[in-house]
Design a protein with these regions (language model features):
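Extended, loop-rich substrate-binding clefts of extracytoplasmic carbohydrate-active enzymes
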Residues: 96-152, 156-162, 568-632, 636-639
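Surface-exposed beta-strand/loop patches in extracellular or lumenal glycoproteins
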Residues: 179-182, 653-658, 704-712, 718-723, ...
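Short hydrophobic/aromatic patches on beta-strands that form ligand-binding or substrate-lining surfaces
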Residues: 221-222, 284-292, 386-388, 425, ...
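Localized edge beta-strand/strand-to-loop motifs within extracellular or lumenal beta-rich domains
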Residues: 163, 382-396
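Acidic-aromatic substrate-binding/catalytic surfaces of carbohydrate-active enzymes
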Residues: 24-107, 128, 494-584, 590-593, ...
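Flexible glycan-contacting loops in extracellular carbohydrate-active proteins
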Residues: 409-451
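Extracytoplasmic low-complexity segments
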Residues: 204-265, 283, 293-298, 303-306, ...
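Short, aromatic/His-centered strand-loop micro-motif at the edge of beta-sheets
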Residues: 361-385, 442
Length: 919
């Protein structure tokens, strides 16, 4: 589709922008910037977007525009008309034809590169979906990434990558439609399109030495020695089974190659018709290396009816917080919440691992589904041989680990009742994760997470001696046993450039998790510093919830907006629930030597993606736009903007330690003290968390909140706190801090699951602080806004007092000449000025009560393309690290100068700023 609007219609849209369409269409110079276009259309009356909703690229003869009114398919506008680019991939959703994504739930744009001669715009969208709230047909493998590279001479290269079921197809260099065209005064010309063509090439994995012998005569045997492709052969029947999931990941096994399962989607099937028939005896065996313990039972191999779980009742306590008033009486009979399930009553057989790392054998013997669970606990990242047997003659079930008995059970001497369903490897029936925190934990499919090799079925019960020989036959050497071919799982933290600034990147975690996603080169953002070893990380694995990372790669977050109760949906509605990053996203708005501005946008959804406080007429519910103003001293101020017409009982802050695999909470958090609260007079209260949470925490008059990490750099939060609390419940014997692993990274419909091991990413929630409203509105686009300062520092709470004062009680500014002042904007940690001449001078009236600490000056309408000369008290600043500046484009396309000074003062500062032509 190539839509054109002739010049006769331009009059109707000439007021289309905060910068009018007639203005940006004739700008005359190459320039790209964020803005918000106001076309006057009816949908904009209720549009819950901020000042950076759209992108304009100005060229000599017109403007190339990415507008939310078209769900961001761009158009070219000149004096002669308006032309949309081709809709190469057809779009349809919950909106009108022109704006198929009604409120752009899944459509967004980012300006990933902007220079004097070239701009690159990234457009991501879901081409087809249906329904309302929640939407139907939403799938992480179906998103489309488009890039537009626009040069100053009007040439455009457009690349289109469409989501694929298999990650290798997504990554294939041939999975790309490339279109080129020219932007001319008379329209879009010289279009050429090259369609995608997949290469289909795959390299074979390198395996161990193949061991061909087998103890006994298996009636089914998956050797997993294919080493490449999407087929695994059952070697007895010769039947080929498709390896289902995002990728067939072949790795070195105990013999030849093994197959790695991702914990969610991976599965191999063999039809019951081609499978072995067992009746009076059975042996199931296989080699496994666990990456993370299953959420619940996961099979190594099974043939079962997969009778659904039946819920008998809910039991246990609710969550609570110390400091809450009017707490409900707790059920003292149950220590924790849990689901009481009816006894499983399946048909067939099953060998697998439970959610706590114990191997188990289950068999339908006569009329009873018998279960044998070993007391042996299996470690992670180590090869084990697991075997289970049943023998009708002896009436015994046995289980073995590494060739040794690990459990037995006497059962009736009856035949095995065989299931008519497919044999499955790696994945069974949908289950609820074990150890739920609350009722909003739902049934879903999960698979084994780790490596599987040499899976065999026998129609006889191998003896203990034969099981031992089977183990010895395939046993790897000690080094290989303890170092299976799996990625180590370490939270990603970027490149460590040693420079201050932000960059887009594609952060890697571990391969089977990375394979779940269809993102191109720019999904994530990292902000780094040149004078301290901390970072801000905005990563899709945490739903882009902003993370502060210290020198020991320990993560912390002050979290997000959250609502519940009367907002619709199931349980908590929060960005944490967008586990697939369907909707949450981040963009770099500013990136200069003086500061970085990052925009994080998200809807408040439950685990089924039901948006809170949804209005069917407008399509809008609760959305948040958070803006991070990050400076070279490692300090960030965030403006938290929540759009809502619901009950205003949202959460705005939750202090959390984010834990990577193999990080226990008590390896990251100090217990003596854990929390420090300070006021502006330098008084600090310190709270221990030795045997559990403190119950005497007092937030009165406190402005500084520090969580004590086992590192030099600790996370701090500064604000006009109106109160707060400490998590006082949901503590288990795993740690003195409450710890859960339903988030981050986990792809499961749950808003609460207790951690039992440090096998997965997890988090420990510690505190809440309550903040005053900074701005609000109750009109057609109702919102609340609050602000907060945060960062990581090696300073004590007492040493943070000057910084807190400089922001909470900022020194006043007095203009002397050359500009007007809009005062100090606490939401940006910056003085706001409008230039009226080439030389500006003003006084910052610093004092003991209102000190200056590393101030920023934002000077709009800066007429010069170059940086400025600056003097303090008539002296120049010599060190470039003490004076940092940059020029950005405002939302009207004009220049803005941003200046940051590394200076602390309790005395007035005389500041003069001049263009380089002035001195």
């Amino acid at each position: 589709m190539n839509m054109k609007i002739k010049a006769s219609l331009i009059v109707a849209v000439s007021c289309m922008a905060v910068v009018a369409a007639s203005d940006f269409a004739l700008a005359g110079k190459f320039n790209a910037y964020y803005t918000k276009i106001d076309s006057g259309e009816a949908f904009e009356k209720y549009c819950r977007t901020g000042a950076y909703a759209d992108i304009v690229v100005d060229l000599a003869n017109g403007a190339f525009v990415f507008w939310r009114g078209s769900s961001y398919i761009p158009y070219w506008q000149t004096r002669e008309g308006r032309w949309f680019v081709d809709e190469v991939i057809e779009r349809s959703g919950d909106g009108p034809v022109k704006r198929p994504d009604k409120v752009n739930t899944y459509s967004r744009v980012a300006l990933v590169e902007s220079g004097p001669d070239k701009a690159v715009v990234y457009w991501r969208y879901l081409p087809r979906f249906g329904g309302k709230n929640p939407h139907a047909g939403v799938d992480a493998t179906k998103f489309v990434d488009e890039y537009f590279t626009i040069t100053a001479d009007g040439n455009v290269t457009r690349t289109i990558r469409q989501g694929t079921a298999k990650i290798d197809d997504w990554r294939d260099p041939g999975n790309k439609t490339v279109q080129t065209f020219r932007l001319t005064p008379d329209g879009i010309m010289d279009k050429k399109t090259q369609r995608p063509g997949l290469s289909g090439k795959a390299e074979a994995a390198k395996g161990a030495q193949v061991k061909a012998n087998s103890v006994g005569n298996p009636v089914a045997w998956w050797k997993f020695d294919e080493a490449q492709g999407d087929v695994a052969v059952e070697s007895v029947s010769g039947e080929k089974g498709t390896v289902e999931g995002h990728k067939s990941l072949w790795e070195k096994g105990v013999s030849g190659t093994a197959l790695q399962f991702d914990g969610y989607n991976s599965i191999i099937r063999l039809s019951a018709a081609r499978g072995p028939k067992v009746s009076s005896a059975l042996t199931l065996e296989g080699w496994i290396a666990i990456g993370a313990y299953p959420w619940n039972w996961a099979p190594i191999v099974q043939q079962a009816d997969d009778v659904p779980e039946e819920l008998k009742q809910l039991k246990g306590r609710r969550a609570w917080l110390t400091g809450e008033e009017d707490q409900e009486e707790e059920d003292e009979e149950e220590e924790y919440f849990d689901f009481a399930l009816k006894k499983e009553n399946d048909v067939g057989y099953f060998l697998g691992i439970d959610g706590l790392g114990h191997p188990g054998l289950k068999v339908r013997v006569g009329q009873v589904w018998e279960e044998l669970v070993s007391d042996t606990h299996l470690g992670r990242r180590r090869w084990y041989h697991i075997a289970g047997t049943y023998d009708k003659q002896s009436g015994k079930m046995n289980i073995y680990v590494d060739g040794k008995p690990a459990g037995e059970r006497k059962v009736s001497k009856s035949d095995i009742i065989l299931s008519s369903k497919d044999i499955k490897i790696g994945k069974g029936k949908p289950r609820r994760p074990i150890r739920p925190v609350r009722a909003n934990t739902f049934v879903d499919f999960y698979s084994f997470d780790g490596l599987l090799d040499e899976v065999r079925i026998h129609d006889t019960a191998l003896s203990a001696a034969e099981i031992a020989r089977s183990y010895e036959t395939f046993k790897p050497i000690e080094y290989d046993r303890d170092n299976p071919d799996m990625d180590k799982r370490v939270l990603p933290a970027g490149r460590s450039t040693g420079k201050f600034g932000a960059y887009y990147t594609h952060l890697k975690f571990y391969e089977t998790w990375d394979n779940l996603w269809r993102f191109s080169e720019h999904p994530d953002i990292v902000v780094e510093f040149d004078e301290q070893p901390t970072k801000f990380v905005f990563w899709r694995g945490v739903g882009y919830i902003p993370m502060m990372v210290n020198e020991k790669r320990q993560w912390y977050s002050n979290e997000f907006n959250e609502t519940w109760n009367k907002s619709g949906g199931q349980g908590c509605q929060e960005p944490m629930s967008d586990k697939e990053s369907y909707t949450n996203h981040v963009r770099i708005i500013e990136n200069t030597d003086a500061r970085v501005v990052v925009h994080w946008r998200y809807p408040l959804v439950d685990v089924f993606h039901v948006i809170a406080n949804y209005n069917e007429d407008t399509g809008w519910g609760d959305w948040s736009d958070w803006y991070y103003y990050i400076y070279p001293d490692g300090v960030a101020v965030k403006t938290m903007h929540l759009w809502t017409n619901g009950e205003r009982n949202h959460e705005w802050q939750e202090g959390m330690a984010i834990l990577g695999p193999d990080q226990h909470p008590e390896q990251v958090l100090e217990t003596e003290p854990s929390l420090m609260l300070g006021d502006l007079k330098g008084n600090v209260e310190r709270y221990n968390w030795v045997d559990g949470p403190p119950d005497d925490v007092d937030y009165d008059n406190k402005k500084i909140h520090v969580v004590n990490y086992k590192a030099d750099y600790d996370p701090y939060t500064i604000g006009n706190f109106e109160g707060g609390n400490v998590y006082g419940g949901e503590v288990t014997d795993y740690a003195v801090f409450p710890s859960w692993n339903h988030w981050p990274v986990a792809q499961m419909p749950s808003d609460g699951r207790y951690a039992s091991f440090p096998d997965r990413t997890a988090h420990s929630s510690l505190t809440h602080v309550w903040l005053p409203i900074y701005r609000e509105d109750f009109s057609d686009r109702p919102y609340e806004q609050k602000i907060m300062m945060e960062g990581m520092s090696d300073k004590s709470p007492e040493e943070l007092v000057p910084l807190a004062k400089s922001w909470l009680k900022p020194a006043k500014i007095k203009v002397e000449s050359g500009c007007s002042s809009q005062g100090y904007d606490r939401s940006q940690r910056a003085y706001q000025l409008i230039s009226q001449a080439s030389k500006l001078s003003f006084i910052i009236d610093a004092s003991e009560n209102s000190p200056v600490v590393n101030p920023c000056f934002v000077i709009k309408k800066w007429d010069c393309p170059n940086n400025a000369n600056l003097k303090i008290n008539r002296g120049t600043i010599q060190s470039p690290k003490n004076l940092r500046q940059g020029i950005v484009r405002d939302t009207d396309g004009s220049r803005t100068l941003v200046v940051w000074l590394k200076i602390t003062s309790v005395k007035p500062l005389n500041v003069s700023i001049a263009t380089s032509e002035e001195d």
